[in-house]
Each structure stands twice: as C-alpha cells, then as structure tokens.
Regions:
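Structured, active/binding-site neighborhoods that engage oxygen-rich ligands
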Residues: 2-272
Length: 272
C-alpha cells in the first residue's frame, strides 16, 4: 500500500497498486494530526506509480530548522540600525548577546516551547504553553544558553500578568503592542493542524493571544499560518503570496498594513 497527499486539501489517500485506479478513503489512521507515513506522492499521477517528493518529515524538519537557522543568522545584526552593516551571508554568531555560531534567541526558544506543548498535550492548551514560556523565562527551558538572556517587553508583560492572574490569554490588546513575537514562534501550529484548515487558522490566532492580543498581531498570525500550510501542501510561491480563498480575513490584514506599514517602517530604525 502506498499513499499520496492531495495538495488542494491536505488529505491523505491510500492506494493499492494491485488495483489500478482504486483510491481508498478515509485516510491513514495516525496519532492526533501527526501522519504516520514516510512518503507522499503527486495526486495527479497515475494511480499505482510512486513519484517520490519531499517527505512530510523533510518539510516539517525544514520548517523548524529554517526557523532556528534564520534566527541564528539574524541575531548577528539584531538591534543594529538599518543600512549600517554589510549583508550577512553566513551564520557567524556574535550580536548583542555574544552567541556562539548556531545558537538561537528567544524567538526559537518560544517556538520550541509551543511545539513541545502541542505534542505533550495532544493539541492546543494555552495554559500549558504559558507554563512552558514561564519555564523558559525562569529556568532557561529550551534556551540555547541554558538561561533566558533576552525577552521582549510585550512577552514579559504577558508572562507577568499570567503569573498573577493565571489567565493564559494575557496578551495586551493595545495596537502599539502588535509586534511580531507571536509570528516568529508560530510554525508548530500549522505543522500540527495541517489536515484541518479551520483549526490551523483558529489556533494560530489563539496562540498569538497568549502574549500578543492586538488585532493586528492575531490576524497576521492567522494569515501566516495559512501561508505555511500552503507551502507544506506544495503550493507554488506565486499561489502562496497571492490573495487566496483560504483566508477569509485577508482584507483585514491588508488594511492594517495599508494604513500603518509606512509608519512602522519609519519608526522601526533597528533590526528586531
């Protein structure tokens, strides 16, 4: 028995190569939303002929490793004024936290906390996520240096509120707090909920609200989750970046940036 994933829906089908043209539903049984398969196949190829693509495992690893590698590369110029440095073309470490080559910052630490929470709780659990963020902040959990050496003000404020009131949705709703912290850690949400678009969108927003509750941050997290999901399902870069039917609130995000992007670019003088 072999399997393929329909790139239009993310659904898995089993194929019996001895019965040409026979496609069987429902999907392979798995644990939660983690697919118990090693290969996927083009949906429009002749039934029974295996066409090896990048495996889902490769894509998942690439998504998380790309996040961490980008973080480790970018830390070299974090907080430097735009245009004040030569382009970075390799992973060299250093930066404001004097990191070794390959060490990541708070962004990847929080991404790992979110991923671990989804696996440990078999799904979305806002309280467990905040507990893990606190463990990172207090004990260095998932930190590349063994301790928390940097934390954004918005996240710090949310963790402080959670410590006092135990409401996991502690993110400020003030527009001025709509930073990108909840997007940088987001990848595990579309990875875990790949087979369900509605859950991907919903829990992307909920994952933002724990620390970044401003509408701009929440809606942007939802959109970014959809873009990651489309990439995982094999959509082209052009399709991913075009306005699409998968995310009904695209106009909300577009209007945010149409109204505020120039102000943000003018005000953000340093790399964050």
């Amino acid at each position: 028995m072999v399997y393929y994933i329909d790139p239009n829906t993310g659904r898995e089908y089993s194929i019996d190569p001895t019965k040409r043209g026979a496609v069987t539903e429902p999907l392979i049984t798995g644990i939660g939303n983690r697919f118990d398969i090693e290969e996927d196949y083009l949906a429009d190829d002749e039934i029974g002929v295996k066409v090896k693509m990048n495996t889902l495992k490769d894509k998942y690893e690439g998504c998380l490793l790309g996040l961490a590698c980008g973080d480790a590369v970018g830390t070299t110029v974090e907080f430097k004024p735009r245009g004040s440095f030569a382009p970075i073309t390799d992973m060299v470490g250093g930066g404001p936290f004097d990191l070794d080559v390959g060490q990541w910052t708070d962004d990847t630490s929080m991404a790992l906390c979110l991923a671990e929470s989804l696996l440990a709780q078999n799904g979305f659990d806002a309280k467990d996520q905040m507990d893990k963020y606190l463990k990172w902040y207090n004990d260095g959990y998932m930190s590349s240096k063994g301790y928390c050496f940097d934390i954004g003000r918005t996240v710090s404020s949310a963790l402080g509120k959670y410590s006092l009131h135990k409401n996991p949705y502690a993110g400020s709703t003030e527009p001025r707090t709509a930073g990108n912290g909840s997007i940088m850690r987001l990848a595990a949400i579309p990875l875990y909920y790949l087979s369900n678009l509605e859950k991907t969108i919903h829990f992307a927003g909920e994952s933002s609200r724990t620390t970044h509750g401003a509408e701009e941050a929440v809606e942007s997290a939802k959109l970014f989750a959809v873009l990651i999901r489309m990439a995982l399902l094999g959509h082209s870069k052009q399709d991913i970046l075009l306005k699409n039917e998968y995310y009904s609130n695209m106009d909300n995000v577009t209007s945010f940036y149409a109204n505020h992007i120039h102000d943000k670019l003018n005000n953000e003088k340093v790399i964050r």
